[in-house]
Amino acid sequence: TDLIHRMTGELVAEGSLLCSTLYWNIITKKYWDEMLDFLGITEDQLPSIRESGEPVGELKPEVAEELGLSPRTVVATGALDQVCGAIGVGNVEPGMFSENTGAALAICAVLEKPIFDKEGRMPIHYYGIPDTYMAHTFTTGGMVLRWYRDNFGREEMSVAELLDTDPYNILGDEASKVPPGSDGLVMLPHLQGAMAPEANPKAKGVFFGFTLKHTKAHFARAIMEAIGFI
């Protein structure tokens, strides 16, 4: 919304991001009057609502000049990052399923209509395709390995700098020498709470079963296995 406003002067938003505001109704695709009243704001103070991918306008002349682009360049609405990722891999029809592992591990399934879980285990988002929805759950993914690298992989980071390579390559090479199952070392990667199978913001990460025989490579592999199997 902010970038589009800076580029075009228009104040607009779209459903997949508005889902996170708590004042947009995913069923009616309108602002939620009850919540607006509670917050003490009016619809006039909020962005107009568009569908994802809908053209908003052309670049403002001063922005086009700064970016070196034609002032006729059309700016369109985007979508939530995981929505864009799912559409990018072809997840565009109800019944399809995709998974993305980056900083987070996200699972997305396209739905014709929102199906709400009374237990709150599966968030539902508006999708980047009109009148389509997404069941979307996520947990910590690559950020767990980054945490390990930053806190326990200083040696690997130094070696990687000398060899002009990525420290993750070195961590991966070391982990590959450990047998599947990490010799009994098990990890739960809930370093920022858990979303599934039950939403639990108080969930914590766990290393279980480690002994004197386990090495740094075992811990690196246990993290990779945890992310892969979750």
Predicted feature locations:
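Active-site core segments that coordinate phosphate-bearing ligands/cofactors
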Residues: 1-13, 22-33, 37-38, 55, ...
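A glycine-/small-polar-enriched, mobile loop at the entrance of the PLP active site in fold-type I
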Residues: 18-24, 44-52, 134
